[in-house]
Every structure is written in structure tokens, then in C-alpha cells.
Amino acid sequence: MKVLIVGSGGREHAIAYSVAKSDKVDKIYCTPGNAGIAEFAECAPIGAMEFDKIVAFAKEKEIDLVIVGMDDPLVGGLVDELEAAGIRTFGPRKNAAILEGSKAFSKDLMKKYNIPTAAYENFTDPAKAIEYLKTEAKFPIVLKADGLALGKGVLICKDLEEAEEGVKTIMLDKKFGTAGNEMVIEEFMTGREVSVLSFVDGNTIKTMTSAQDHKRAGDGDTGLNTGGMGTFSPSPFYTEEVDEFCKKYVYQPTVDAMKAEGRPFKGVIFFGLMLTADGPKVLEYNARFGDPEAQVVLPRMKNDIIDVVEACIDGTLDQIDLQFEDNAAVCVVLASDGYPVKYDKGLPISGLDEFGKHEGYYCFHAGTKFDGDQIVTNGGRVLGVTAKGKDLKEARANAYTACLLYTSDAADEAR
């Protein structure tokens, strides 16, 4: 079997690692890929949004299965284009990927189908949003750009002044582009944040293990929000009681709601949950594997990923017994100094050969590329250093030990 993976981050590297373990796979390609993915796949310099080129490449290479890792091409309809060309593809079609592509849509869906989430209002007029903030809002309050914004389109505002500035940033200054044409104003929730990834075949949903990520750029949970500076799995706060509640009131109801709306979802749904004093509530949906959550979840999965992916496409997920190792994993993101604001690229990285010598250590590349034979930095989040352990404490110690194998002038890590 020939498999094509679409994307270039640590998530896609983790997917490529899992695909490479399958006995069913003879050859892996990746567009555009990165320096780490190149260990497992032949990378082609085609951007994830160059749909025509991706379809042509898949036909030329006689690809049997495409796995789309990134949110932008999913929301843009890459799966539809590949399927129209007769190519088997894992991921939601455009009309289902809206679950992530529009926060206003997802909030309205949850409201309609009684899926627990924070109270909210949607706005397309900034003047009406500000009027609402002045007359109805309780602070702190959350402002969310409706569309995709690289995980950075959420502002937590402590008072009216900050909220008015936030409306200006999102809707008038268009800091997040067209993602800010519509905005969600949402009640601020407190509690533990947990991520749960799931496989979905349109009817059946099978959850993977839980994870928790660390979004702040600085040590000690300080600094700006990022796409994710580290993560661990499983979450000690995701208890059996929470799992039972979410299966009954969140997971299956979401799949059923999308089907009822004529938008059957096949692929991965990422549930961002807040464990509040009133019970679990949905913070957000993503229509793909999380990044860096995939880097701690996929190494713990016992199943052949190809079996699971094909079951999702074929609607036979109910026949899969999804299993995970009884251990823990921690991922530490090594980011360029200055991320997420301003940072240099092209800085050399060394020490990567050492990872293959250690059982249970993984180095997933995010922002890397080749400069001749040298691997150099090519983004804000550079590497995801992952390690397993019998429990979270051991896994964390192993992950930081693994970080010592890596050297670069760019290093900045989450603690």
C-alpha cells in the first residue's frame, strides 16, 4: 500500500511514525513534509493548500490512501477533491470540517443538541458586540475569532476596556484575517482543561486516551498563548466518571448531531474539554489530531493505525478494539527563542541521531528543514521531544533527559 500524508508539523511526523510501523504499508509520501518526516517518507515540495497539485501527485504516484493531518486543507475541502478523483482519503469532508472551521457553527450545534458548553453569543457586527459587552457581559469574558487562527484566535479579557480592544483586534483590525468576520463572545469557564482525541466513522465514535497540553510560551505557565508548548497523556483528571459522562452527553451526541445536520463526520474529532464545577463542558472541537497531542497519544496506541483509519472510511469502526499501552508519555516542545512573536530561522540543529539509540524516546520534527545535509530550524515550534514512562513522573523525567540530547542556538523549552 502507498500512503500520502498531507502536512508538515510534529503531528504529521507522529502520524508518519505510526504509519511506518504498519505491515500493510510499502511506501510513504508526504506533502510538503519536513526534515524529520523524511526519515519515513519521500517528501514532495507541494503546499498543503495546493489541492490540484496534491490530487495530481496522488494520481501520479498511484496513492492508495491519503491522510490529511492539517486543519486548513480539511476546512478548505481537500478531502472532497481527493474523493472526487477516486482517491481514498482519511479526514472529514468540507461540510463536516466546519465543526472546527466555524466556532459560531459549533456553538450553535451544541446549543441545538444540548451538548454542554459555555453560554455565548455570536456577532457579525462589531458595534453590536461592543453594545453586548457594555450591557450584558460578566467579566472576565472570552472572545473567539470564528475561523481558523493557528490556535491563537482566542482572547481572555478581564474588563470592558480589554474586551473593546479585543473586538477591535479581531473584527476591525482583522488580526486573524477573515477568521474575524464573525466572533463568538463566550462565558469564561474555570477548571481543568483536558483533550480527548477520537476516531469517528460517521456513526461510531471510539475515543483514544486523554491528554493535557501546555499553551503558555514561558516557564511556570507564563507568557503568551501558543499552539502548544508541551503535553502529557493520560490526564490524571480525566476519571472514569468524567469519561462516562462525556460518552453519554458529549461524544456520541456530537457525532449524531453532525449526522442529523446532513454533515456525517469521518476522521478525527478532538474534544477540548473544561472540567468545571458543574461538570465537563466543551471548549472547542478540532477536526483532526491535536498538535502536540498526537505526539503523546499515537506512540501509546497498540493498534495498526491503517486498520483504524480504513475502518473509519468504510464505516466499520464498531469492529475495532482500540487499545493503548498502560503507561504515560510526555512531550516537551523545543521552540525558537522569541516564539510566538519574532524568532530566527535557519539555525543548525545537532544531536538528533542520538534519539534512535534510546528505547521510548521520540523526536518529532515540527519547524525543521534541510539546508544541504544540515537540519536547520524553520519555524516557531521546532521539535517535540517525547518520552514514555511507567507513570507521568517518570515520563516527564525521561522527556527532559531526552531534551539534553539536542543542541541548537534556537532552543527554548516549556517546563
Mark where each language-model region is.
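Single conserved hydrophobic/aromatic residue that forms the stacking wall/gate
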Residues: 406-415
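Active-site nucleotide/adenylate-binding loops and adjacent lid/helix of ATP-dependent enzymes
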Residues: 4-5, 100-182, 212, 236-252
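Active-site "cap" helix and flanking loop/linker of ATP-utilizing ligase/carboxylase catalytic domains
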Residues: 246-269, 286-358, 371
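ATP-binding N-terminal substructure of ATP-dependent carboxylate-amine bond-forming enzymes
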Residues: 1-94
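Short, well-ordered alpha-helical segments
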Residues: 389-403
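Short, well-ordered beta-strand elements within core beta-sheets of diverse protein domains
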Residues: 231-234, 333, 381-389
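Internal nucleotide-binding/catalytic subdomain
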Residues: 157-294
